[in-house]
Design a protein with these regions (language model features):
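Serine-esterase "nucleophile elbow" of acetyl-processing enzymes
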Residues: 18-55, 74-75
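Charged, often glycine-rich, active-site loop that binds/positions anionic groups
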Residues: 63-76
């Protein structure tokens, strides 16, 4: 799954013809412990391009948590991001649709709005990890 994600991100990065891109990763331990930001940066470097990364990946964090997390908001507000990768807590997307509609979508929308407010040219990338039981 990580290989597909990295390939999609690299395709998006290189399709714009710029050598340097800025990517912010907001997620939790699935992104942080697996060091996805650094791995993506290394793969990008192997193509001769540069990826400037930053992240906030506290364990168990949700979109709701990131939408009010001072560190996440400050990093978004720094602006000039080309991509902001959002990763929801691993179980939430598998919950009943009513729960997801109430506890996931509004915060994904809120984060995306904040991202676009401070980074009008950014693309929000939703990264879904494998489910956890």
């Amino acid at each position: 799954m990580n290989k597909i994600y990295i390939l999609a991100l690299l395709t998006a990065i290189t399709s714009f013809g710029q050598v340097t891109k800025r990517v912010l990763f907001l997620g939790n331990s699935y992104t942080g412990v697996n060091n996805l930001p650094s791995l993506t940066q290394q793969v990008t470097a192997s193509t001769g391009n540069t990826l400037i990364i930053d992240s906030n990946t506290p364990g168990g964090h949700t979109f709701q948590g990131h939408s009010t997390n001072a560190t996440s908001i400050q990093k978004i507000q720094l602006g000039n991001w080309d991509f902001v990768v959002l990763q929801e807590q691993s179980q939430i997307p598998s919950f009943p649709i009513g729960y997801v509609t109430t506890n996931c979508y509004p915060y994904a929308t809120s984060l995306n709005s904040t991202i676009l407010q401070y980074n009008p040219c950014a693309e929000t990338v939703f990264y879904m990890t494998w489910g956890r039981e």
